[in-house]
Amino acid sequence: MQQLQNVIESAFERRADITPANVDAVTREAVNQVIALLDSGELRVAEKINGEWVTHQWLKKAVLLSFRINDNQVIEGAESRYFDKVPMKFANYDEARFQKEGFRVVPPAAVRQGAFIARNTVLMPSYVNIGAYVDEGTMVDTWATVGSCAQIGKNVHLSGGVGIGGVLEPLQANPTIIEDNCFIGARSEVVEGVIVEEGSVISMGVYIGQSTKIYDRETGEVFYGRVPAGSVVVSGNLPSKDGSYSLYCAVIVKKVDAKTRGKVGINELLRTID
């Protein structure tokens, strides 16, 4: 694996000079191997090690290199044709392989090659970009998008129209992460490498980036880039110091533990916020 990483790191340093016409065989093979390993879930761009999320930057670099070494090509679809550098993940799947891997894909859901989809996942008509990791038991609902290299945990519900930001455009240092057992409400956006920690519930229409204030109304504490575990979050506003205006924020209205969350439905958690 170290040799593979060395090839990727070296090629990335000279990426501006690499084209599909001049890329060497060693680099092409290394990039293709990494994409295949990301596709199968054997590698992932970020993982939790000793309780902390670690981003493997070289894997992200391999994803970026894949755009340098490949030409656009015609991609056949059921209703149309497409023209892109990245093949579709399920292009060569047959019924036996779908049965073996154990997830559902509802047309016209689109998943790019290099994204991992775990067992018991349901993909409604949605989009999952290259390098993303979607873990077991997760629902990606209609028109939700999972951005490049985003990490989605087990038993997550991404509601209709949710946007989970990617790392490629604009270029971000770390992927957006939704940990296990989270619920992200309809039309919410979580971007720019924000981490939503385990068991959190995000109401509909909440927008969180690195500069968004995440205000805990019980403690007065303000977080940036991280929603603490077990938070129930709604959209809100905080006043300026002189009270002349207010700016958007996300508000943690309560905290719930796994026991409470197991007893109470998501809708009830969001309705009883006073």
From Swiss-Prot:
GO terms, biological process: diaminopimelate biosynthetic process; lysine biosynthetic process via diaminopimelate
Output the CDD domains linked to this UniProt entry.
Answer: LbH_THP_succinylT
Give the binding site residues for substrate.
R104, D141
As recorded in UniProt, its EC number(s) are: 2.3.1.117
How would you classify this enzyme at the top EC level?
Answer: transferase
> Which Pfam family is one of those matched by this entry?
Hexapep_2
One GO CC term of this entry? cytoplasm
The answer to whether UniProt assigns keyword Transmembrane helix to this entry is no
Gene Ontology terms for molecular function: 2,3,4,5-tetrahydropyridine-2,6-dicarboxylate N-succinyltransferase activity; nucleotidyltransferase activity
The reaction(s) this protein catalyses: (S)-2,3,4,5-tetrahydrodipicolinate + succinyl-CoA + H2O = (S)-2-succinylamino-6-oxoheptanedioate + CoA
The record's annotation in SUPFAM superfamilies points to: Trimeric LpxA-like enzymes
Where in the cell is the protein located?
A: Cytoplasm
Task: Quote the PROSITE patterns the UniProt record gives.
Answer: HEXAPEP_TRANSFERASES
Identify the main location.
cytoplasm
Q: In which pathway does it act?
A: Amino-acid biosynthesis; L-lysine biosynthesis via DAP pathway; LL-2,6-diaminopimelate from (S)-tetrahydrodipicolinate (succinylase route): step 1/3
Q: Which UniProt keywords apply?
A: Acyltransferase, Amino-acid biosynthesis, Cytoplasm, Diaminopimelate biosynthesis, Lysine biosynthesis, Repeat, Transferase
What family is reported?
A: Belongs to the transferase hexapeptide repeat family.
Q: Which PANTHER family match?
A: 2,3,4,5-TETRAHYDROPYRIDINE-2,6-DICARBOXYLATE N-SUCCINYLTRANSFERASE (PTHR19136:SF52), MOLYBDENUM COFACTOR GUANYLYLTRANSFERASE (PTHR19136)
Oligomer status and interactors: Homotrimer.
Task: Name the chain's protein.
Answer: 2,3,4,5-tetrahydropyridine-2,6-dicarboxylate N-succinyltransferase
Organism lineage reads as:
Bacteria, Pseudomonadati, Pseudomonadota, Gammaproteobacteria, Enterobacterales
Gene from which this protein is expressed: dapD
